[in-house]
Amino acid sequence: MAVLDIVTYPNKVLKQISKPVERFDKDLHKLLDDMYETMIKNNGVGLAAIQVAVPIRALLIDIGDEEGKQSKDTLIEVINPEFLTWDGTQKDTEGCLSVPDYFDEVERYKNVKVKFFDRFGKEHVMEAEGLLSVAFQHETDHLDGHLFVERLDYIKRKKFEKEWKKLLKQKRKK
């Protein structure tokens, strides 16, 4: 397994709409394994393929067990996700490996039902609530070319853009 480079905002790659996965083969398995290594190394709870510059509809979610411990047992590999139902709303603080060091409150659906395939092409339907629901929505947004900061209201979005420019300037000085 390899740790892959994560594409960061404002790279235009993140705006691409990902294509459906058609082949469930060893190349897909290697990508998923490398994505898992990358996500864990970067302390993430989710990672979409587009975040490692691969524009396919594949993502990982691992919110951990009851104690927050992540492992292959708590990993959900999601290929070609499709939301079947959604209801309620909740606000939670989100962050993103593609927008490092920035966190803000985003409103999402509280409950979702998602149809997807695993690495072997087996179909699954899962109901998710709370953090898992947020993770499904956040990662699927990536597949559609959207970042969580686009869901911020106008004032928060302007604040983000100002803070982001400041962070970039600080990083360039180092």
UniProtKB/Swiss-Prot annotation:
SUPFAM superfamilies: Peptide deformylase. Fe cation binds at C96, H138, H142. One of its GO terms (biological process) is co-translational protein modification. Pfam families: Pep_deformylase. It comes from the Bacteria. Its EC number is 3.5.1.88. It is an enzyme of class 3 (hydrolase). Binds 1 Fe(2+) ion. The active site is at E139. Keywords: Hydrolase, Iron, Metal-binding, Protein biosynthesis. Its cofactor is Fe(2+). InterPro entries: Peptide_deformylase, Peptide_deformylase_sf. One of its GO terms (molecular function) is peptide deformylase activity. Removes the formyl group from the N-terminal Met of newly synthesized proteins. Requires at least a dipeptide for an efficient rate of reaction. N-terminal L-methionine is a prerequisite for activity but the enzyme has broad specificity at other positions. Belongs to the polypeptide deformylase family. This is Peptide deformylase. It comes from Nautilia profundicola (strain ATCC BAA-1463 / DSM 18972 / AmH).
